[in-house]
Amino acid sequence: AEGIVEAYIHPGGRVGVLLEVNCETDFVAKTEGFQRFVKEIAMHVAAADPAPRFIDKGEVTQEFIEKEKDIARAQAIATGKPEAIVEKIVEGKMNSIYKDVCLLEQPFIMNPDLTVQQYLSSRIAEIGEKLSIRRFQKYVMGEGLEKRKDNFAEEVAAQMGQ
């Protein structure tokens, strides 16, 4: 497989994305149209809120699905809905969740009338070659770090008491 890995830094420098998109030939990988497409998808991943976690439904883990179904089921039961309706509510909620967490299901930021999948399909038709989004990772500065909670007054008092 040919293609490129795009490293995109969103303006302001707080968000970055690594994205791999494959094509069939190195000729296509070198074209401006393909490179622009890859950059646009990287920009989408950087700007999308909620941020995509998976490429498509097939990549969603069973653990994630079960957890989300349990949450949706508990919420539906808490409202007093009958059991027959609860499962339909859970199914609808899961479809909504897929639109949030699956990149190809999301509305494309640069043209919200299209999903990312529809935009990908239009680019495949235009370029005339199979393209596939292989993997991506979004990085947000400071994400996952625990912020220290210092109390300056207590710190000064502790030092004065020594």
Each language-model region and where it sits:
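N-terminal assembly/interaction segments in proteins that build large macromolecular machines
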Residues: 1-162
